[in-house]
Amino acid sequence: MAIKVSENGRLFTLQTKDSSYQMFADDKNVLLHLYYGEKIGEENLSGLIFCTDMGFAGNPEEAGPNRKYSLDTLPQEIPGSGVGDFRDDMIEIRHADGSFAADFRFDSFEILDHSYAIPGMPALYDTEEEKGETLVITMTEKASDIVLKLFYGVFEKENVITRAARLENHGETAIELEKMLSFSMDLMYENYEMIYFSGRHAMERTAERIPVQHAKVEIGSTRGTSSHHYNPAVILCEEGAGETHGSCIGACLVYSGNFVAAAQKDQKNQTRFQMGIHPTNFCFHLEKGEAFDTPQAILSYSGTGLTKLSQQYHEIIREHICRGAYKHAKRPILINNWEATYFNFNEEKILKIAEQAQKLGIEMLVLDDGWFGKREDDNSGLGDWFVNEKKMNGSMAQLAEKIHKMGMKFGLWFEPEMISEDSDLYRAHPDWAFAIPGRVPNHSRNQLVLDMTREDVREYLLERLTTIVHDAKIDYVKWDMNRSVCDVYSHMAAQNRNGELYHRYVLGVYDLLERFLAACPDLLLEGCSGGGGRYDAGMMYYSPQIWCSDNTDAINRLSIQYGSSFFYPISTVGSHVSVCPNHQTGRVTPFRTRGDVALAGSFGYEMDLNKISDEEKEMVKEQVAAMHTYYDLTHEGLYYRLTGLKKQDFMAWEFVAKDQSRALLTIVKTDAEGNMLPVHTKVCGLAENKLYRCSLDGEIRSGRTWNRAGLTLHQVLKEYESIRVEFTEVE
């Protein structure tokens, strides 16, 4: 059993292979956080807490004359609001009398021999290879009939602990839930730094690192999606922690909507670490008998640096989040027509692109935006999911049949959650779009957002999408979402329910995705939101790969894919070779480099292959062959970042087979200067006692030597040039 409980039922120790998490219900039934870190025994660590009178720290009634006991200074698992803890709370409730107070005390516990599910939301699931365990702790509100259930999931082998919570109103009167996070924990006696991932459209997930001090460090999104601007995954690490050393705690939210993640030192230098749904524009009305569930947060600990932490997240997301026919099945190498044609295409152009792609070994053609309704630009047509047969010279089934006869798969782009005002759908159902009565709604990309909280909207979309997919025998769908969500108002919701709409929007999207995939179980679904605007574990539950960024510039992609790698498996990274000069940056990079960067992901092309040179066509063949050669390495192997946050003149990364029989190391020169110095890089992950041959010069060394001495290139890489180096076990 990974969940250990003391004889008196008040000390809880969660054990994974390499980590321990401990909490304790004290004699006043306050649930205290004691420890999360390197694996230890089951001894009670409550002695680590030092209570002292800090002044102006309130004392609950149970403390009696003891001024040292205060919720304002204790390390808690579930800090409430309005009852004496003045730090950031985890939960805020407004009662029927207008008061706001949340003071939850320990009541009971239950242990389940399986992982827990969350109604209507994605969460880690059990497999035949590993089942999780669950601890459910029931808390009761001190002065009302409100019950809080805390869920702790343990995946022992992957060193993962999950957190989620469920609030149930058992009282006679309604309450307003104004804030409820997925987890809070108070960490004692350490100085931490936070690593988070910021960005913007076409430049997502830039890794940044700052110390956690008494001023709060907070990131989040109120855009209706997890967003390009911050990712719902952060790391707390000890000062100076690196790839192979130092304690690190990761937190990844399995959610695709508004979120917040924060860390702050308190007056005792304890660090309060929290994550969950953002409280801005959030208010859930709960009548008697109603409940609210938070999204799941995935926690993981590494005592040996960031690399191990990332590998633990890669494994848990790949094996216990990603699902469906393509969870492990080999995914086709694709070509997408978007940057080749934009909206200016017809059947003839698409078939010519497909014919050339097929000759070069590419396995699937994806037809992007512009095939439906009145859609010659981005100003009209969204919502009218009917094939423009005039533009396509026939039905989609006819085009798909021609592609299939070439021996290729065929994919199609959709943007189901959006609607254009210039569309038949909007003219028939203007109330289906989010818009506040009496206000002109904001436009973004000249489109509005459909009210995904409505069942009739989802039914329409499900019918349209499944009909097209089935009729044309579509193999792949790219599911896009090209704006942020605002002007939120539903004609189907009561006024006291409008604070629920941002969350119910996400639940509506999840519901549609679940039903769509159930109707099309063999489909490969790739997520997208203007690239990486919804690149999160919630969407990976439905789409095992996500278009990582609309920026296809190979050099910018180094930073984007570097940041993505801290939490998300390389198999989830949609990455393509595109034309040069690049359409986003104007940069010119070697064709080989573009391929090497795209190989660190779910590989494809974004160009008209009829317009490239014969030499480049040969490179396409080589890259396609390389993708097949290295597929198992890049999609299932262990990933190592060999260069870091500090500025260097090259970037390097490595994949190592799980059996350590081979490895692939890639180097890209990012900067050049006169009289250049040689490139020397680390090598990681090779078996200490095995011998490996290097593909550069045939030199054979032990894994121990390669791991410690590294590799020096004896050739000068010019700016933006790249090289792949393979290490193969010698029997």
Task: List the model feature ranges, each with a label.
Residues 5, 10-21, 30-264, 280, ...:
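Polysaccharide-binding surfaces and accessory modules of carbohydrate-active proteins
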Residues 671-731:
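C-terminal beta-sandwich/jelly-roll accessory domains of carbohydrate-active enzymes
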Residues 18, 165, 289, 335, ...:
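Conserved, mostly hydrophobic/aromatic
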Residues 243, 644-687:
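Carbohydrate-binding surface patches
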Residues 393-395, 429, 433-590, 602, ...:
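Active-site neighborhood of glycoside hydrolase catalytic domains
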Residues 100-106, 284-303, 720-728:
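Short Pro-Gly-centered flexible turn/kink motifs
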Residues 326-463, 476:
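Aromatic-lined carbohydrate-binding/catalytic grooves of carbohydrate-active enzymes
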Residues 70-115, 243-257, 300-325, 362-367, ...:
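Glycine-rich, aromatic-flanked loop segments that form ligand/cofactor-binding clefts
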